[in-house]
Amino acid sequence: MRIERVDDTTVKLFITYSDIEARGFSREDLWTNRKRGEEFFWSMMDEINEEEDFVVEGPLWIQVHAFEKGVEVTISKSKNEDMMNMSDDDATDQFDEQVQELLAQTLEGEDQLEELFEQRTKEKEAQGSKRQKSSARKNTRTIVVKFNDLEDVINYAYHSNPITTEFEDLLYMVDGTYYYAVHFDSHVDQEVINDSYSQLLEFAYPTDRTEVYLNDYAKIIMSHNVTAQVRRYFPETTE
């Protein structure tokens, strides 16, 4: 973690995601677990106080900027004399509230983080049941493709006319790459499957990753009518 003293009332710090994980906090827990989130930010404040003698007195104003490799946080003490007369308990309560506002932001500034992570949590719980259902899928046919980035996923959701909305589909992510799997029932005509695959290949690429591999090593981002969910959470990209 890099700490910069801006002036008597303001400090700025930059911490990488790898540094966050090295301190025993996962990125997902940090943004969704209130107790763990507060524990992390208070530990940051203790470290700032040790290095810069920046004692928490009264209300603090917190501003966060997310970048590809980490998060930059600016922390300022209030200069308002009336606010400085707050009790220690009130100041602590306000800081906790500000931390919660901070935790409510996504790493890209999206407002729907909590809802997305709740969905992902449900999907993780469903992974076990999906494995139990694997035997029932012996009569289904699955296609798996990969997207180079999120923009390609969004373009597919907006510019294709997918028939896949009628079938179970899953969007995975592993090593920064998005994988999309679609399960076709045994009664589906092969021509329909070929047409769906052709549409996918306008935005995605073939892959040798299997669904077994993805279930073991990837994270499920969305499931069940993925394209509709992508359109709900993300605006259409422009050229």
From Swiss-Prot:
It comes from Staphylococcus aureus (strain JH9). One of its GO terms (molecular function) is protein-macromolecule adaptor activity. Enables the recognition and targeting of unfolded and aggregated proteins to the ClpC protease or to other proteins involved in proteolysis. Belongs to the MecA family. This is Adapter protein MecA. Residues 118-128 have a biased composition (Basic and acidic residues). Signal peptide: none annotated. InterPro entries: MecA_C_sf, Neg-reg_MecA. Residues 118-137 are annotated as: Disordered. The gene is mecA. Homodimer. The N-terminal domain probably binds unfolded/aggregated proteins; the C-terminal domain interacts with ClpC. It holds the Pfam family MecA. PANTHER family: ADAPTER PROTEIN MECA, ADAPTER PROTEIN MECA 1.
